A protein has these predicted regions:
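Second-shell loop/turn segments in exported
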Residues: 13, 80-87, 173-179
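Stable alpha-helical elements in mature extracytoplasmic
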Residues: 23, 92-95, 99-102, 184-191
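A small/polar (G/S/T-enriched), proline-flanked helix-loop surface module common
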Residues: 34-150, 206
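Short, low-complexity, Pro/Ser/Thr/Gly-rich segments in the mature regions of secreted, periplasmic
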Residues: 187-207
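Secretory targeting and sorting signals
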Residues: 1-12
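Envelope-exposed proteins and targeting segments
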Residues: 18, 78-80, 156
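Short N-terminal segments immediately surrounding and downstream of signal-peptide cleavage
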Residues: 13-29
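A short, solvent-exposed beta-edge/loop patch
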Residues: 120-193
Length: 207
C-alpha cells in the first residue's frame, strides 16, 4: 500500500517547471540567465495579459506552479524571457483558447493591461515558424502610446506552446528587426524541444 501511495504521488505531482526552462546556451552564445523578482510562484504574479488585464483571463486562477527567468547578453539589444507554468487539468488548454480569443477581439483603441501603465494601443499580428508544438500561438506585439510624456513605439514577440497541462511562453524584446523575430523563433523552438523531452536540452551560465 505504501508503494502504491508513493507511485500515486509521483503520477499526481506536476512537472518541475525549473527543469523545463531554457538554458542560456539554448538562447544563444554568451547569454546568461537572470532571476526576476516576480519569477517564482503564482501569487501576485501574472502570466497572461495579452491585450487585456490578467483579470480577463480566468485560467490565471488555475495555475499551480510557475517560473519566469530572463536572458541577457552584454552589448546585445536582444533579450528574452521564458515562463513555464503548470495548470490544473485542462487549464493550459483553456489558457491557449483565452489568448486566441483576446487576439481575435483586441480593441483598436488604447487599453489598460497593467495598472502601473497608462492606456496603450496593442497591435497583434500572428506569425509562423517551424519546429514548434502543434497549436502554438506566435504573436508580433506592437505597443504604441505615451508613457510619462514620452512617445512609446515598441515591438516584441510572444510565443505560447502547450504540452498537456504545461504552458511555456517565450517573450523577446529589442529593436523592431527581422533579427528579433529569428531570435524569438529560435528560443521557441528550443522550448518546444524541452517540452517534448520533459527537461532542458542544454546548459549554460547563470547571473
Amino acid at each position: 500500500m505504501r508503494l502504491l501511495l508513493a507511485l500515486a504521488a509521483v503520477v499526481a505531482s506536476p512537472p518541475d517547471v525549473q527543469k523545463l526552462t531554457l538554458t542560456p546556451a539554448q538562447v544563444g552564445p554568451n547569454y546568461v540567465l537572470v532571476q526576476r523578482t516576480d519569477g517564482h510562484g503564482v501569487t501576485n504574479t501574472v502570466t497572461l495579459n495579452v491585450c487585456g488585464a490578467a483579470s480577463t483571463y480566468p485560467s490565471e486562477s488555475r495555475r499551480l506552479t510557475r517560473i519566469q527567468v530572463d536572458y541577457l547578453k552584454q552589448k546585445s539589444t536582444l533579450g528574452l524571457s521564458n515562463e513555464v507554468v503548470t495548470y490544473r487539468p485542462g487549464g493550459a488548454a483553456q489558457a491557449m483558447r483565452e489568448v486566441l480569443q483576446h487576439v481575435a477581439t483586441c480593441p483598436k483603441k488604447a487599453i489598460v493591461t497593467d495598472r502601473s501603465l497608462p492606456p496603450l494601443k496593442y497591435t497583434l499580428t500572428r506569425v509562423t515558424g517551424p519546429k514548434l508544438l502543434k497549436g502554438y500561438i506566435a504573436l508580433r506585439i506592437r505597443v504604441t502610446g505615451n508613457v510619462q510624456g514620452k512617445k512609446v513605439d515598441q515591438t516584441s514577440y510572444a510565443i505560447y506552446q502547450r504540452k498537456g497541462d504545461v504552458l511555456s511562453g517565450t517573450y523577446s524584446f529589442g529593436p523592431n528587426t527581422s533579427a528579433q523575430l529569428r531570435f524569438a523563433l529560435h528560443a521557441a523552438q528550443e522550448s518546444a524541444l524541452n517540452l517534448r523531452l520533459g527537461r532542458a536540452a542544454g546548459g549554460g551560465p547563470t547571473a
